[in-house]
Amino acid sequence: MRPPTTPPVPTTAPGRQGATGGLRKRGLRLTPEPGEGGGCSLEARGREEESRQKRRMVAQASGREETEAKENGKVTEAPSDEPQPGTDLVRKTSITNSESLQTVECSEFQSMAFLQSLAKEELVEGIKRRIQIKKCKSSENPPLKITKNEATQNIMVESQDELFKNTPKYSCNSLSPGVEKNCSFESHDFSFLHSEGCNNKNGFEDEPHGVCLHAEENSLKSKKENLRNLAEKDDTKTTKFLKTEKNVIASKLLLEESHLYQNKNNGLTSCLQSEKNKYSVEENNTGRKHRKKMKLSEKEEKGIDLTLSNVCNNSELVLQEHQIGMEGKETETLEHKKSFLKALRKMNHNTLPPVDHLCLPETVGKTSCRHSTNVVLQKTLESSLKEDTKNASETLGCRRLQPEEYFKSMTSSTVKSPSDSHPMGKRSPRGDLKTDTEESKVSCRRIIPMTGKRVWPLYSCARITAECWKKTSLSDLNDSLPGSLGNVRQHDFLMHQTNQTHLPDSKRLQPSLIERTIESSSKEVYDSELSSLSSVSSVEPTLLDIKETIPHDKKTKLEEPSRNGTEVVSSATEDIQLSNITQILTGNKKKKGNLSKLNLTVAPQESQEANNCANKTVHRKACITKQTLVAPDLVKILNTGRLTNFKIPLLKNKTGKRGEVSARSSEREAYSPLELLDSLSGVEAKQNRNKENICTTSGPQSLNIHSVTPGQTSSHTFYNKNSCTSPSFTKKGYDNKTCNHISETGNTISNKESLSIKIENNTFSCDLGYMEQSSFCSKKQEAFVPISSEISGRKMTKSISELKLGFPDILKAYEDDVLLIDVIQDDPELFGISSEGDLSFASEVSKISQEPRVSEEHPSADFKHRHLPGKKEPGDLSKEVALLDPGLLKLEICPSLSAAKEPQHDPKGAAISLEATEETVISENLEDLSEQARASDSDTKCVSSDKATVVEEQENTHEVCKSKDSRSVEAVSTECHLALGPNTLCSSAPPLTLSSHQDVAPAPWTNDFRFPGRYSVLQLQNPETCEIFKREKNFGVFQKPLGLMIPHRYCKLHFNTLRGCERAQCKFVHVPEQGDEKICMDVFKKYIRVNEQRLLHRAAYIFLEYYRKFPPGIHFSLQVLNDLLISLLKHCLLKEVFQVVQLSIMAKMLPALKILLKIFEYVAAMKLRNAVPALIEIFCKFIEAGMIPDPEHLNYIVKLLHQAQASQQEISAVLEAKSRLQVRQLRKNWTCDLDSALSEVENCKEKGDWTKLGNLYISIKMGCEEFADFQRFCACVAETLTEDYKEERPGVPFCEFAETVSKDPQYSEVDKTLLGRIGISAVYFYHRLLLWSKGRKVLDILYELKIHFTSLKGLTGPEKIAPRCQIVNVAAEIFIKSGSLDGAIWVLRESEWITSTPLWPCDRADVLHRHNLLCAIAHEILGKNLYKQTFEVLRNLPGFQNSQEAMGVSQSSLLFNELLDACIESNSLGISSSVADFMVAKSIPIDFSFLRRLITSLGRSCLWLKARAHYKSALSLGCYPPLEGNVYRKLLLVPSYLSEIEMLLAIEIFLVSNASSIQSPGAPTQVLQIVLKRCEESKPRSKDDYQAAVERLIMAARISDPKLFIKHMTVNINKEQVYSLEHCSAVKWLKENMKWAGKVWLFTNH
């Protein structure tokens, strides 16, 4: 099927035809007559010259209107029926009529305010230029086509006018709302006439949203009549308002409050009218059948009914008045625009358009299919109408009475509105005036009514008409400065129009947020326009393509495509954007050398989700991906040349995101607008939570670096709802020749673009370097002329270099075969992956989901490429995605090339941070850019540097990205190099956006460059889709294993894949555990062999994490460490090199000397001055660790430091180390020879210079490589130190020698060991000679140096094989002989009193010697009353510790009894009790008298537990007569020699033994007798002794607790006293003490 050569005749939908249909049928023109609309030119109210020019321009406009009306009559049809206006108001009114009226109301005040701000003096000169420009224009004016609701809209507008006339605030201006509206467009939108004429000649419609104007003729007449007062108002009020500008700003809030009530009343009227329209729309749109082929106009008007929301009719009335304003007052001149821009720049610093989001110049017309499917709907149509009307009326009411905001509203709404009218007509024969914007190209023309059927989207390649490919060219201009408004002429006007953007779906914006954002955006627009920098900055999401000519020869045209900064939630704008992309990709083929680069910035994720929902039907049929799809993706499909493989995206298994609806187009067969409305209900709420800025690239080239207007950014601006500002302002030059079409994928053309921006004498170099574009476009190389313009008193200069761009020939085939899609609309094979394995659009969209979510607090460019000095592009631990065109894409950023082509950079290494965000006000903050740029080194996430290389991607086994840039890298001295952070992050999005927000810790770099030839992908912030994508699609593609054998507990993605683990919280191990050092080595070897930058990053991370926790083991390989360091250096990872080297030095793993030299070479080559201090520190650590570089190495290091421009202090540090090493080297030269060293020892001995001998020891230790030779030297030293006995010298040689050695900085444990062994030899030597004092001095110095010699052996003589016991005995004996018992005990304690053990065997003689030595020590200590030390020595006698050494135990009994007696005498009951226990335990004979004395002393001291224990021990040893025979006979025999304590203990045993009988019921009849036995000793005892014993017995009964009572009974035959124990006291005692007494006396522990 061939596309129609001319667009089908638009017709209105059945049942919705209005007065417009009648007008069309009778062939009447829809626009008012010149006499009606241009009435302002009939009466001369100003100067005569001005009136004459006005009349002339009105006549031209009138002629244009008539001509185009005739043309329009030829191509349009009118329905037969023509209802009278007002007869069918409820049924035929538009869906959002009330909102349209509010929009008109808003635009009126905006227009009036701006008109009054124009300077009177600028009118004359502007009129002259205007006349000249008008002569070049077509005399045709676009006809206004009225399709519906004329009468209703007219009535509503007039009623709205009445409301405004009653407003006291505006009565002073004597202007009705209609007049104000006309004035607003007269003042600055005269530029529409230019673009309008050109577009009409070319048969294009110059409307961003593809919607035609609709207005009622009568309403237009009434409005244009009021224009006659405009000229007078202009001249008289301009100066007044300019003077009172600041006062108006200050009174803004007051005015807002005063008119709030009246505003709400106006909004209520609109709300009621919208309610009436709701049901009529639903009634008219039901029951319609889908027709496969329909006329273009029929589809358009039905598409309006389908999904057109409040914005549609809102735009109708606005553009009606816009058109009238342009016709009625054509005499406004070019100077108006200049003054307008100047005034606007000043005003936008403070305020914003109050209802800019409501003034949407969208109309119902030919290309309204863009709105038919993508307007953001509410959950139900009814709720949408109510909410829209309410919010619009409230917002309007709150803001309409702020006169200051009139000025600001012009920047984003009214100025742009004329570009919305694109009537169809014949192309103009004048080729030099073909100046239509990219978005004006005709796109899809098929619209389906609201019947639930599919709707062809705007950018469907199946519905492109032949006219859409017609090209126009910009006229050759000879102006020297395109930034000068006086020379820009029509193209500057066109850019001015299209720079303005729309904001549909106004209720999504909070007023405060909108004010801030629109203020910033409006300011950016006109500042950048004056500086010849194409800039787009606004909250509105409509993509506008701006063309601005920059003269560069007669044949040169510079088109400046600017893209809207962001995309707000509205899906309607997304369709327009994608439509513009399609038009640019296909429509520019015939344009001579001109191709605008489209730049599309994708909104936050929530906005994307909403847009995806609205585009469900679009993606199903038009084979276009979601909003994340950019033009290169479409180009990739076109370049393949295989339309049979043209895929429609499909994302199945959605995991819950409503925003992914558009990718599931195959799940449902019918998508009616009501269904879309329902599906989008959940997404609407998310539109208010847009917190992310995701900048992507759209258009023929997906990767471009643009000149950026410096701005200031604030982090909080990213929380604004639906507020996104374009951070890029671009200008590109194209040749005036036909594009070279290149079909093969991968063909890249390199071009350079350098940008130098000078701001207030601060020159910043923004080096945009080399850039290889995709094979889709190929352009002739052309250099831009420098552009200079003044912005708020500041000069900005831009030097843009040449660009190359190519188009493939496949566009021709694409244009011819656009209707092939029509027959495969429902083909299920279109969804999925092709047979060749190429990813379809669905999988391509899914590929985006692999990328992690960007932190919501910070904006980020989706495509960043970081660079460190080197040939390869360094990777960083942050995730990055390379945006690739279908071909191999290479973008290199090099130092900016001036006229001399020499690299230049900030001498301080400060990189400029070029940013533009929502709240950026460029003019106010240009002076702060210098500080901001320097702060960006540490604060920004993306830092621009002097050179960056984005390498082209190659697919290999390991997905290694190799850099093809073989050029030398410029040295950059910024701190980024020293810190080794990302030296350059170049956004591959159109703006060179360098965000100043670096708060988040960056996640590890785990993303790859995509394989060449695949479609470019963008970041999709959806981790759920990411998981699905990994699971189903490309897990194997992107995660190829490296072939490592990894244990199960380790993360295989982290260790065994190139990209690493992407899990947010991985349950597997990412760092090897202790004992898995072999795994570390294997991983390092593999990563080194692969030699990929990210793997080397990972290897450094694993090395640092592992060896910070665990010391190196047997599997550690020094060669692997060296190889790792070399690989890191090759990839310019200096930070990781420093970290690994420092850790290796701390862990005693010294890398090779060549590694250190290579580091110095790298730092010197890159001139990294800031890295020198850290490198010097590492060098010193190397020297301290024992590395001795050669003198030539040191000289080379000094040379490299000079090359790196190191300071003199740093170089001096190396020279000092060199001098020290030279001294050591000299010593090494003569000490490495062992013979010469030994001879030197003899010399020291002869001279008695033991200090020199110590220094010689240190030198030998540092220079000797063989430890055996060093031990031989130490033995020689030991012999030398022990052969000076012949000479009578007071000092001890060993002491001087040991002190010298201990002062060495390298003094270590090895030195302690050697000194201890030499000291043992000296001790033995003095022990043999009985030189106790000298021997003790040796022992003292060993004690001071904390050398544990007791575990060592000597170096020479018998002490070399002496057992440990012998060495300890010798040392202890020396201490004893020298009178130091403490020293002797210290030596014994140091040896842990060990004699002979399996580990330290010794002879019996040594054991006996130890026993005698200890006994001697105990005897001496006991004499000093040191009982504790004596007992410690005695209990460590040989034999007590080891039973095998049981010898001479009886010999030690005397010492123990002496110690026990001495302790009792001194009342040391604790030690005496311990001694008694030890003697009983070790069966050492104990003197009973000492034991009885101990028991008595313990009892008298109330230590009853110990007394009872020792009493039981004494009973068992036989110290007391046995009691068993008499106890149970109720008779107790008590010897008279016992003490009262012993008697009481005996009575206790007696009571416990007879407790059962005593406590029995018949016990009172029994008698317990105690007999005080006389002693049967040879020594006769006197009467007094026995009498004392009787008293002790009575005392024993009394001291018991409770007391016992005894009675004297009789005297037996042996004259022994017999006593009876009172029964009651015995019972009482048992009752209280039986528990513990039974345990103590009835149960023995022996």
Curated annotation (Swiss-Prot):
Subcellular localization:
Cytoplasm, Cytosol
Compositional bias (Polar residues) spans?
A: 409-420
Q: Name one GO biological process term.
A: lncRNA transcription
Where do the record's region annotations for Disordered lie?
1-90, 407-439, 850-877
For this UniProt record, give its keywords in alphabetical order, as a comma-separated list.
Cytoplasm, Differentiation, Spermatogenesis
Comp. bias intervals (Pro residues): 1-11
**Keyword Cytoplasm tagged:** yes
Compositionally biased intervals (Basic and acidic residues): 63-74, 429-439, 853-863
Reply yes or no: does the keyword Cytoplasm apply: yes
Q: Main localisation, per the record?
A: cytoplasm
* GO CC annotation, single: cytosol
Function of the protein: Important for normal spermatogenesis and male fertility. Specifically required for progression to the post-meiotic stages of spermatocyte development. Seems to be necessary for normal expression levels of a number of testis-expressed gene transcripts, although its role in this process is unclear.
Protein's name in the database = Protein TOPAZ1
